[in-house]
Amino acid sequence: DMEAMSQSIGEFFRSESKDTLALAKIFKKQLDIQNEFEKKAKGTIAESFIKANKPHIPDGHENAIEYVRNLKDCYFSYIDFNDKTLQSSNFLSEKIISYVFGMTDENMGDLVSYRANIVDVFDAMKEAKPAIKISLLTILWQQMADLSLESTANYISDTYLLALAEKAQDKKLVSELTKFKTTSIGTIAPDFSLEKTFGDITTKTKLSALNTDNEYVIVFWSSACSHCMLEIPQLKEFVKM
């Protein structure tokens, strides 16, 4: 099957063999298997998946470096993002996630590679309808958020997703993206007014105007929260030390 062919190709390159004829036979067999699968699946639901999952199959000799490069370059070549059958499954989302995380460049840091791969993903689905772009980018954005890769999640939002959501008038998604960014680690906190009381004197100021100490602790709490009622007094005593 195709998985066995992929293993054979990997073993050939790892062995550093110079037998180009043997490699050509592997590629030929791989193409034959692909064509046979497509022929048998013609007219069925499986046809869309088999065609979309077709790997890069060289029609001539390629060394290991060329093969890996072309494997990445051709990753999306046979995928139709507007195919209703593919859209009805998780195939498209799994493919883009596998690409972003699996096709990293060892000469780059992971975060740099992720961003470069995200650009590739968006370019690959440039002909897709806006709703499909929003759906797939949201899944990718959520994946980054779940992995605490906040800067990458915000990159997806800032570069592509937020504009698409605004154009589609998806207020819920716009709100979610905006709230996530404003509460992300490293994001400058929004300024707000507050009161300072020393003895009987209360003065009004802003968060941005606090400059008498190197660090501040800002606590948001509620009298309806049992943990807050227990721990706020403890914090008050702690800061007196």
Describe every region a protein language model picked out:
Residues T203-L235:
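Short active-site neighborhood of thiol/selenol oxidoreductases, capturing the structured segment around
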Residues D1-I201:
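Oxidative protein folding and maturation machinery
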Residues M241:
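Thiol-based oxidoreductase modules, predominantly thioredoxin-like and allied folds used
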